[in-house]
Amino acid sequence: MTEIKETITITFCDCAENHVGMQQLGKLSKKGFSLDDLIKIKEWYSDRGLSTELFDLNWPLESLELEPDKKAYFLVIRKGTNLHTNSDELMNQLRNLEWDSKAFMYGRVVNKKARYNLCFGNINQKPNYQQIKGRVYKFTDIQLLDQAKNSLEEVTGINSLVAEGNYYYDVNKCGIGFHGDSERRIVIGIRLGSTLQLEYQWYQYSNPVGERMTIELNNGDIYFMSEKAVGTDWKKKNIPTLRHATGCDKFVK
């Protein structure tokens, strides 16, 4: 029997939603992380003995002589979660929550098969999918998650973070296709559970341009996206924009 491998990603951010078009928590920030911000964050973790990797996501455009309106970067802190909380215990806490397996889309409530979702903020809320409201957990009711949030706010100087959870309950079946995060500009991600690759691809005029980039994310890794890497502008066609995807082949090919 094949072992079922599962992954949870928690995205701390300025604005979160259980599914596209549903209720949003938080407010879209005026700006996201710059390269200077990421370098300072990188140095903070490096000073504490952690392995860090700063990826330049702009190189696929260089051979095409394309210039993005903003440069894009992606910072990974290997096993950084354990500096803020216990990653294995956090995974167990999150796995045992009630995850949304339904969402309002196509004008009706449907079952979610690609992944399950949750939001985290300053309230508890039961889902009412017909009213485009998903389940929300209060940070302070999940001690280890609240601990991580407060610590990350101190590191970054960003207050009032909310969070969005994606539960890939079987990495051989689950995932999310290429997209940008229209609803936010700030992304701090925590990856828990099985290793999953994050795929990045530049697009222009709705078509992929340049080579695809692959970043492997493991249990306990933290990542920070620069503003351009988040993909808030991904629906703009006339400029190069970034989209990202993760999961099984169905979603990333």
Curated annotation (Swiss-Prot):
Database matches in SUPFAM superfamilies: Clavaminate synthase-like (SSF51197)
Entry-linked InterPro entries: AlkB-like_sf
Q: Please report the name of this protein according to its UniProt entry.
A: Uncharacterized protein R156
Q: Taxonomy-wise, where does this protein's organism fall, top ranks first?
A: Viruses, Varidnaviria, Bamfordvirae, Nucleocytoviricota, Megaviricetes
